[in-house]
């Protein structure tokens, strides 16, 4: 019975392939190879290196999934947004597979995929607010009951996750910065350093991390010898201020929209400080909080496969001749 969908994710620095049963939503296969170690010496993702590593990793993963090929009914792939050279690797493989196996091709928006990480084993439920925080995006969305997406707030500059990466790089801590800063902050012995919360007195529903990032840079310059205790203190102050900023704007949004259901997705949503605060916020406003599983917060092909199940039912197929590569976020108005 041909009831399986194979999905490929390669939008940034994770090479991943998943296979899902479109009828039961059972994950039949999922494998991810991260490039974090290779990029860590540069303090961030190097696009050309990412592309080369995808070209090595994706075929290795695909080979492990071959036993499911006879039961495939479609091929899905992340086509937007992301690094062009990274996306291209996944798209090329998906088109080759779709052509060779004579299967329909389904392009999936990466951010939609993150939303589906809330519903990996269940039908998607609408009418909810969503916070998406990752290395490339910070936004609050309203997923309406007609499946339309309304953008309520986004960042004016850096993303939440990106700011962690950049602060980690300033202190020569490595990459990715999220977990490094979070763990370092737990070791803070002194808590005398503080930063102003961005846009605290602004009514604008938007995020901005560039000013906070610069404040951290100036604080670092005050110290001739940046020892581990000072690094931990800076990490603590930065993490808490970044979370303060997210919660400050979310509080304003909750007051306006009175959400009964709220979801949190994206790689940076794995931050435990942020998760704890979100739980408190939703308790305060009597909203049901749904968090993406920690294992599937970061980029993965299973969320792409899950999104593809619904896209398959709607017959959202494209020709393999069509140019579907889009580094920018074009198709993101509906689920």
Swiss-Prot record:
Query: What Enzyme Commission number does this protein have?
Result: 2.3.1.234
Asked if Transport is a keyword of the record, the answer is: no
Decide whether keyword tRNA processing is in the record.
Answer: yes
What are the record keywords, sorted? Answer: Acyltransferase, Cytoplasm, Iron, Metal-binding, Transferase, tRNA processing
Q: Give the cofactor note.
A: Binds 1 Fe(2+) ion per subunit.
An annotated GO cellular component of this protein is:
cytoplasm
- Residues given in the record as Fe cation binding sites: 110, 114, 299
Location in the cell? Cytoplasm
Superkingdom is Bacteria
Q: Spell out the reaction equation it catalyses.
A: L-threonylcarbamoyladenylate + adenosine(37) in tRNA = N(6)-L-threonylcarbamoyladenosine(37) in tRNA + AMP + H(+)
Query: What InterPro entries does the record tag this protein with?
Result: ATPase_NBD, Gcp-like_dom, KAE1/TsaD, Peptidase_M22_CS, TsaD
* GO BP field: tRNA threonylcarbamoyladenosine modification
The positions annotated for binding substrate are 132-136, 165, 178, 271
Q: Which GO terms describe its molecular function?
A: iron ion binding; N(6)-L-threonylcarbamoyladenine synthase activity
As cofactor, the record names: Fe(2+)
Q: Which family does it belong to?
A: Belongs to the KAE1 / TsaD family.
Q: What does this protein do?
A: Required for the formation of a threonylcarbamoyl group on adenosine at position 37 (t(6)A37) in tRNAs that read codons beginning with adenine. Is involved in the transfer of the threonylcarbamoyl moiety of threonylcarbamoyl-AMP (TC-AMP) to the N6 group of A37, together with TsaE and TsaB. TsaD likely plays a direct catalytic role in this reaction.
Q: Name the NCBIfam families on file.
A: gcp_kae1, T6A_TsaD_YgjD
Alphabetized PANTHER family for the sequence = TRNA N6-ADENOSINE THREONYLCARBAMOYLTRANSFERASE (PTHR11735), TRNA N6-ADENOSINE THREONYLCARBAMOYLTRANSFERASE, MITOCHONDRIAL (PTHR11735:SF6)
Name this protein carries in UniProt: tRNA N6-adenosine threonylcarbamoyltransferase
Q: Name the source organism.
A: Campylobacter jejuni subsp. doylei (strain ATCC BAA-1458 / RM4099 / 269.97)
